[in-house]
């Protein structure tokens, strides 16, 4: 089946698809304060989704392309779930968030198919994969159209990997008590086995969102990167997120001695946002298997346990948390009680001495991850490093922060 035909088949209208903002039915807690963060983007009036320009540009999307797609959504006069929110157009048609981003992805998919140069074709496929992922954002459970966009993203990512430098292997890992999960092992040029970073991504991202991290930071230093999806999304969609948030990653870690391309004696974990919750748990529970753990903007305690902090977080992000926890129609009170159980301090881990070296990077006044969370991580480690990342200029400092984190990881792996 050709890629174009697959797109037509997946998106063929069958019934009235639920609109993304309606999937989590929480009781709203009133007016939203403006929020801006380096890793999550910012709230913009009249948009349900946070617009995450920095990360989208970092993944290779042109700023003008972002504005073009946004303009098509704004200009639509189709029916919306909420007339005040541009990105709530109902049904797979012009103006719908998923439709417009997927349409943009198909443009790059066609360019990739027409391009004879393998490297350039690979770039176009990667571009298409990223756009399909933005179409599926924020990846709420039960969002049929988003899940179809994710399927196209994975397909495009596999096509890209066949053409880009280095080697990528799709790997299946067995997890007792449930379905196996699929991960991607990205390997630099040269002979393995390679020192490897196990990526623990954020709750609103897919494992295929981190190719830039591998290509710009790890591959030039001869470090491989292994990704898996977080519980409840993508290839891990059959697993619900539980208080044992590191369950899937632990089983992957335990399987690494049987993976010939990975030097299982030189493995680090890197956690973005809630992925840091996973990575820090691994630092405590699997310290013999890890040389180091790095975190960026960690969600390990305050956001999970502090009601005041939760009130400052955008509706979309709370919807993501509720969706991952399988609490689609729970009250805010019930969600707060459940989130508290995910705090690594409440679980009795953070605050105890940990033998694994841990670094934590943070931004001042980050609404999702205050400095105290990073201090809690680094002060708990026998070899801790605290890294403050200045906010402006945001892109340059983000890159500089990642370079420093990679330096720190490399010293402990190589």
Swiss-Prot record:
E.C. code: 3.1.1.1
Disulfide bond positions: none
Family (UniProt): Belongs to the FrsA family.
Name assigned to this protein: Esterase FrsA
Catalytic reaction(s) noted: a carboxylic ester + H2O = an alcohol + a carboxylate + H(+)
Name of one Pfam family that matches: FrsA-like
Record-level Gene Ontology MF annotations: carboxylesterase activity
Keywords assigned: Hydrolase, Serine esterase
Described purpose of this protein according to its UniProt entry: Catalyzes the hydrolysis of esters.
Class of this enzyme: hydrolase
